[in-house]
Design a protein with these regions (language model features):
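Terminal transmembrane helix and immediately flanking juxtamembrane interfaces
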Residues: 1-124, 221-296, 303-309
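Membrane-embedded catalytic cores of phosphoryl/pyrophosphoryl-handling enzymes
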Residues: 1-12, 148-267
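Alpha-helical transmembrane segments of multipass membrane proteins
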Residues: 54, 135, 139, 202, ...
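Membrane-interface loops
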Residues: 64-82, 89, 103-196
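Juxtamembrane extramembrane loops of integral membrane proteins
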Residues: 312-314
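A cross-kingdom signal targeting lumenal/periplasmic-facing segments of multi-pass membrane
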Residues: 317-318
Length: 318
């Protein structure tokens, strides 16, 4: 987004020139990027068009590459995360994954919306509400339209794209857009940096637990970023009044920390039980094991460190 914000003038000039040259579609794009035009209806139309384009693009990608199945990259990352599972890391990463739940994100979103309405920042409140509504509509619609087999340990409530990653990207990303405009110079990078770290941690934690495929996480980030680019540029183009960001920044980050501290410890056990790594049991008949059944069994420990891949020299029938 910062790259787009830096080059916004040139990009917007080209967009407006294209809009004037193409009056049929241009009247909608001009309304989004022209500060003298109202934006509610054009933004809704753009959101619908963006939703349709994204659906067609990802449906085409899945049909061509995956034929409706997880990609090879998804399977590889899933197996890698299963190999990395460690009891010492399970609880901290389950707590991090819980930060993407609605119990942690909903209070923050509602408090920011209430604060903006209380301060009569209707432009910011409208964009904030549009960001949340489109994110929820996007994930719900795509989850019902795109059918991809889920990881083995996942319940029916999870799918493509990851709603936790999508909403985390939208909420933290658009809040960074709101406050970065008021920060001086190089300090504007900090809200974006914090947003990226939080979303990356939530996405990695959910990959580690096996809650999503890698394509679910990347898809959630991608759709969130696309909507941020459109809505963020439209907001920055129209917003002319400055406001004091310290109260709302304390409110946003402070309430997120409090909600996370309240929800994560209570959700760790449930999440670990829900995404418990499946134990693969294999039995071999004694007679088959004596003849040739022992040969396919692993000859070394399954370790990433070659020094610890010790040979398994002894087999015991029991």
């Amino acid at each position: 987004y910062r790259w787009f914000a830096t080059h916004a003038d040139a990009l917007l000039a080209r967009a407006l020139a294209w809009s004037h040259a193409h009056p049929v579609l241009g009247r909608h794009t001009a309304a989004v990027f022209d500060p003298t035009r109202r934006e509610s209806v054009p933004l809704a139309l753009l959101a619908i068009l963006l939703l349709a384009i994204v659906w067609v693009w990802f449906a085409f990608l899945i049909i061509v590459i995956g034929h409706g199945e997880p990609l090879a990259m998804d399977l590889w990352v899933h197996e890698l995360m299963r190999a990395l599972r460690n009891p010492l890391a399970d609880r901290p990463l389950a707590a991090l994954a819980s930060l993407g739940d609605e119990q942690a994100l909903a209070p923050v979103s509602l408090l920011v919306l209430a604060y903006l309405c209380w301060r009569k920042r209707w432009m910011a409140a409208g964009h904030w509400l549009a960001a949340l509504a489109f994110g929820l509509a996007l994930t719900a619609w795509l989850g019902a339209s795109v059918d991809i087999p889920k990881p083995p340990s996942v319940s029916s409530g999870f799918g493509f794209p990851s709603i936790a990653v999508t909403m985390s990207t939208i909420i933290f990303g658009f809040f960074a857009v709101l406050i970065a405009r008021e920060l001086p110079g190089r300090t504007r990078v900090w809200p974006y940096l914090v947003s990226g770290i939080v979303v990356a941690l939530i996405g990695f934690a959910r990959l580690y637990l096996g809650a999503h495929w890698l394509s679910d996480v990347i898809g959630g980030m991608l759709f969130g970023l696309v909507w941020l680019l459109v809505l963020g540029i439209a907001y920055r183009r129209r917003m002319v009044r400055s406001f004091w960001i310290k109260p709302i920044a304390w409110l946003f980050y402070g309430s997120f920390v409090l909600a996370g501290l309240w929800h994560a410890p209570r959700n760790v056990e449930r999440m670990l039980a829900q995404f418990q790594a499946p134990v693969i049991e294999r039995s071999v008949a004694l007679q088959d094991w004596w003849t040739q059944g022992w040969q396919p069994l692993p000859a070394r420990r399954n370790e990433f460190d070659d020094e610890q891949r010790w040979p398994l020299d002894v087999q015991v029938a029991g």
